[in-house]
């Protein structure tokens, strides 16, 4: 991904840094429904998720996370922008006439060939089970947790997990969060790293660009009134008046563990995420 710096012609473009434009060529059989950005409100109009609303209309692209076109080679035809995720997607034309979108692997270019199966080469973009001859230290993404359900782990832009061990019926992975976890060796994973690794280098440059993404302004609780937030009130710039910060509803914030206790998958986690 190439970062494009705007020419400083207006205040709004002075700090803008965006990636090179990747167009979308929609296929009717690979899109579904006309979706607006989530407004963060329920059927009664009550805010249930803050800082969301507005945004440009979107069409959902159907992504093939399962990679169940077994042993059929496919060719990358286009690399496209997807407004529903920060990673790019690429259109694959398979030998049997099937067309599908997949996550764009880093380094893949138009014309490359990919394939999924149990006896396929361990090369970028190919999908295969962890039980194959995949060497330790291999970079993978789009990893299944439940066999046949489709990839659920390491799907964001630049995400990559590492295969660090195999023992018995399980494989040990180091996830992008730092968590070390056991996964069934029969689960499918895609070789390589998700593309668009420089997504964090982008700078929107102005508030309007953030609004296009459906993200509304975030107001600090300390500048609110006491009726609106536990941190609010006081004369001038006052401290929060509590030992620890809290949410608008009084629950502990900034560091509290939100994972449920005694969850069924606790036995699969060897090291907690950082």
UniProtKB/Swiss-Prot annotation:
Region (Disordered): 225-274
Source species taxonomy: Eukaryota, Viridiplantae, Streptophyta, Embryophyta, Tracheophyta
Cytoplasm listed as a keyword: no
InterPro entries: NA-bd_OB-fold, Rib_uL2_dom2, Ribosomal_uL2, Ribosomal_uL2_bac/org-type, Ribosomal_uL2_C, Ribosomal_uL2_CS, Ribosomal_uL2_dom3, Ribosomal_uL2_RNA-bd_dom
Disulfide pairings: none
Provenance organism: Dioscorea elephantipes (Elephant's foot yam)
Primary localization: plastid
Family membership: Belongs to the universal ribosomal protein uL2 family.
Gene3D superfamilies: 2.30.30.30, Nucleic acid-binding proteins, Ribosomal protein L2, domain 3
Pfam families: Ribosomal_L2, Ribosomal_L2_C
SMART domains: Ribosomal_L2, Ribosomal_L2_C
Gene Ontology biological process terms, A to Z: mitochondrial translation
Protein name: Large ribosomal subunit protein uL2cz/uL2cy
Subunit structure: Part of the 50S ribosomal subunit.
Matching HAMAP family: Ribosomal_uL2_B
One GO cellular component, as annotated: mitochondrial large ribosomal subunit
GO MF terms, alphabetically ordered: rRNA binding; structural constituent of ribosome; transferase activity
PANTHER family: LARGE RIBOSOMAL SUBUNIT PROTEIN UL2M (PTHR13691:SF5), RIBOSOMAL PROTEIN L2 (PTHR13691)
Keywords carried by this UniProt record: Chloroplast, Plastid, Ribonucleoprotein, Ribosomal protein
């Amino acid at each position: 991904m190439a970062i494009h710096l705007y020419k400083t012609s207006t205040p709004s473009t002075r700090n803008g840094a965006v990636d090179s434009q990747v167009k979308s060529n929609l296929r009717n059989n690979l899109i579904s429904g006309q979706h607006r950005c989530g407004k963060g409100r329920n059927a009664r109009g009550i805010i249930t998720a803050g800082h969301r609303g507005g945004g440009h209309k979107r069409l959902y692209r159907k992504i093939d996370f399962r990679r169940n076109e077994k042993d059929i080679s496919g060719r990358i035809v286009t690399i496209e922008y997807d407004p529903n995720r920060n990673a790019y997607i690429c259109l694959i034309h398979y030998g049997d006439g099937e067309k599908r979108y997949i996550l764009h692997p880093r380094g893949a270019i138009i014309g490359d060939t990919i394939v999924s199966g149990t006896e396929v080469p361990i090369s970028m973009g190919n999908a295969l089970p962890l039980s194959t001859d995949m060497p330790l230290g291999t970079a993978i993404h789009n990893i299944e947790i439940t066999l046949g359900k489709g990839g659920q782990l390491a799907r964001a832009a630049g995400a990559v997990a590492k295969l660090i061990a195999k023992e018995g019926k399980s494989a040990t992975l180091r996830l992008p969060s730092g968590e070390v976890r056991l996964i069934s060796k029969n689960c499918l994973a895609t070789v390589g790293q998700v593309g668009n690794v420089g997504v964090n280098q982008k700078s929107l440059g102005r508030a309007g660009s953030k609004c296009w993404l459906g993200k509304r302004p975030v107001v600090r609780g300390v500048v609110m009134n006491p009726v609106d937030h536990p941190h609010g009130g006081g004369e001038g710039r006052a401290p929060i008046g509590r030992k620890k910060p809290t949410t608008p509803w009084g629950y502990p914030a900034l560091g509290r563990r939100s994972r449920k206790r005694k969850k069924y998958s606790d036995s699969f986690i060897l090291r907690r995420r950082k």
